[in-house]
């Protein structure tokens, strides 16, 4: 981290760089989940810092716009110390993926030749034993991957086992391969290439607003959600710029996570299109045709103001109310 901060903030003194690193290192004063959420916000949005005799400013911990400025490392058997009954002990996660000295993803592996070892055991290692023994590592580690060499699944460090999913395509349009051992290569190329990894890390990890941290909801997109949100954004931009009115249609099966796909898309439109004057600060309207979808959508979106960055979220129940609501704002929300 010190190398990255010095390179991207040459005006800061060594003491000021150390203050920033100390703030990040000593982040854990709340619950484990609240600390994880706070640190993730710092990683994505930067950390506020006030240099001597200067105004407060945001200091980036990761450079998303220019990925080559970051320092990427994959470390095998990284030793993490903890204290148990007054004795210093260690844990060694199989692989940690570091960006600028921060362990953003933990990978736990099991031997496919061992008939008693499963990827569920890998999940237990992270979700039970590591959270029990080395939470101070996982505070900085939103993503988790588990694999036995045949089955490989992506999730988050707080996700239930059933919310870990395979990543079956490197790029949209690729055929889905179900061959043994292909899941490992598809995960590596589809998630862990540096540019793709930062894209997923920045905009496709979902936390509810801080007021709901007690619910401990953290998810990462599945591969259909990632590619759908990407394509929908591109289609909407093209439609708005060309004034064609052809935004596109997305078909999703029941249970595929369409509501989260819409949340990922809304975040993209709100935060990643600011340089497109035709879009600017958009007002996004989500129309549903079933009561259960309205309840599902309003429950998610009203708890996602920070994630969406769209201001107040309103549930509107009639066309007249919608007309009145839109009449009170120019854009944004």
List each language-model region with its residue ranges.
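Long, charged, glycine-rich C-terminal linkers/tails
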Residues: 247, 312-321
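Conserved motor-coupling elements within RecA-like helicase/translocase cores
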Residues: 319-333
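ATP-dependent helicase/translocase motor core
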Residues: 1-283, 288, 292-308, 329-332
């Amino acid at each position: 981290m010190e190398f990255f901060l010095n390179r991207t903030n040459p005006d800061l003194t060594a003491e000021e760089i150390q203050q920033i690193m100390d703030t990040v290192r000593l982040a854990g004063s709340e619950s484990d989940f609240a600390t994880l959420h706070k640190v993730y916000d710092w990683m994505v949005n930067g950390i506020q810092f006030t240099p001597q005799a200067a105004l407060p400013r945001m200091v980036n911990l990761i450079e998303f716009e220019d990925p080559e400025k970051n320092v990427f490392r994959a470390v095998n058997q990284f030793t993490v110390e903890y204290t148990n009954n007054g004795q210093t002990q260690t844990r060694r996660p199989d692989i940690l993926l570091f960006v600028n000295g921060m362990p953003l993803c933990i990978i736990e592996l099991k031997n496919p030749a061992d008939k008693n070892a499963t990827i569920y055991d890998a999940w237990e290692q992270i979700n039970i034993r590591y959270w029990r023994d080395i939470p101070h590592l996982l505070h900085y580690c939103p993503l988790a991957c588990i694999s036995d060499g045949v089955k490989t699944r992506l999730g988050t460090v707080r996700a239930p086992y059933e919310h870990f999913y395979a990543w079956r395509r490197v790029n949209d349009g690729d055929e889905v391969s179900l061959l043994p051992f292909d899941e490992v290569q598809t995960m590596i190329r589809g998630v862990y290439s540096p540019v793709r990894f930062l894209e997923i890390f920045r905009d496709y990890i979902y936390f509810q607003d801080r007021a709901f941290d007690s619910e401990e909801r953290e998810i990462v997109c599945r591969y259909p959600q990632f590619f759908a949100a990407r394509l929908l954004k591109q289609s909407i931009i093209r439609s708005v710029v060309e004034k064609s009115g052809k935004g596109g249609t997305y078909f999703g099966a029941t249970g595929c996570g369409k509501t989260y796909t819409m949340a990922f898309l809304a975040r993209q439109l709100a935060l990643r299109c600011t340089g497109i004057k035709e879009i600017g600060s958009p007002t996004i309207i989500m129309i549903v045709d079933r009561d259960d979808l309205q309840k599902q959508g309003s429950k998610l979106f009203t708890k996602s103001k920070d994630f969406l960055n769209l201001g107040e979220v309103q549930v509107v129940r009639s066309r007249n109310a919608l007309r009145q609501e839109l009449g009170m704002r120019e854009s944004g929300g």
